Design a protein with these regions (language model features):
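Extended hydrophobic/aromatic segments used for targeting, binding, or gating
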Residues: 1, 9-10, 160, 165-202
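Catalytic cores of alpha/beta
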Residues: 34-37, 151-163, 190-202, 206-221
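Glycine-rich phosphate-binding active-site loops on the catalytic face of alpha/beta enzymes
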Residues: 52-58, 164-180, 212-233
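Alpha-helix boundary/interfacial micro-motifs
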Residues: 61, 68-70, 84, 159, ...
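Active-site entrance/lid segments in N-terminal catalytic domains of soluble metabolic enzymes
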Residues: 1-161, 173-176
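Glycine-rich anion-binding loop/nest that anchors nucleotide
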Residues: 146-151, 168, 202, 224
Length: 233
């Protein structure tokens, strides 16, 4: 569950009793960071994963082309889509108002003010976040803690040194930096270096069951993905 989720940690905690991991985005607003951390604690989330590969927005060409924002803006193109797909319009009018419940008490952008994801990352997240910040967040959380976005052996070893119990080998689906290395290409070396001390999760490019089998065979403890439900997994 992400800091930018459209459903709150409290609601999710009441709905399911399975293990839950929170994906933390480190904002400039330290009050917001503290609020999110405490809410995840109070909702009995099991793992905190600090995202370290998006402290600034990437050049998301698809979002630029489609004009995607949060919340969605009405444009000629989107209105045409609603006209040709009436179920979309019905859902928009009858379902709950779009909101980002973890953020809305602190920032208008994303809930009341439309903004692209790239611009949100570049203006709201803390570009000065460093290893000391990650270590403090790990200590403040006091439970299972992971860094999400690790792609090198050196960073994997440093993650272990600051107290991480897991790492997510990920390039954010290739959307942050199109020239970033593939998680699959880095996985074996990272597992060899730290796999006996922390859980290593592979994320990125997972679109079918055989991809999971390959990642597990390289030593990953698990696989993750943002759109697995779209691939009938």
């Amino acid at each position: 569950v992400s800091s930018l989720a459209t459903v709150s940690v409290e609601e999710i905690s009441n709905l399911v009793d399975t293990p839950k991991m929170f994906q933390f985005y480190y904002h400039k607003d330290k009050g917001l960071n503290n609020s999110i951390l405490q809410r995840a604690k109070d909702a009995n989330f099991d793992v905190m994963a600090l995202t370290v590969d998006t402290i600034t927005g990437g050049n998301r060409e698809r979002d630029i082309r489609t004009g995607f924002t949060s919340p969605p803006k009405f444009t000629l193109s989107s209105m045409f889509s609603y006209v040709t797909k009436p179920k979309w319009a019905i859902n928009y009018l009858t379902k709950g108002k779009f909101e980002l419940p973890h953020l809305q008490d602190y920032v208008k952008e994303g809930t009341n003010t439309a903004i692209s994801i790239g611009n949100y990352f570049s203006t709201m997240l803390d570009q000065d976040m460093n290893w000391k910040d990650a270590e403090k967040l790990c200590s403040d959380w006091g439970g299972h803690f992971a860094l999400k976005g690790i792609l090198s052996v050196e960073d994997a070893k440093r993650a272990v040194d600051i107290g991480c119990t897991g790492i997510v080998v990920s390039n954010h689906g290739g959307r942050q930096l199109d020239g970033a290395r593939s998680p699959f290409d880095q996985l074996a070396d990272i597992v060899e270096a730290v796999g006996d001390r922390v859980d290593v999760i592979c994320e990125g490019g997972i679109q079918r069951g055989t991809h999971m089998l390959k990642a597990l065979s390289l030593g990953a403890k698990a696989c993750a993905g943002g759109r697995l439900y779209l691939y009938a997994l």
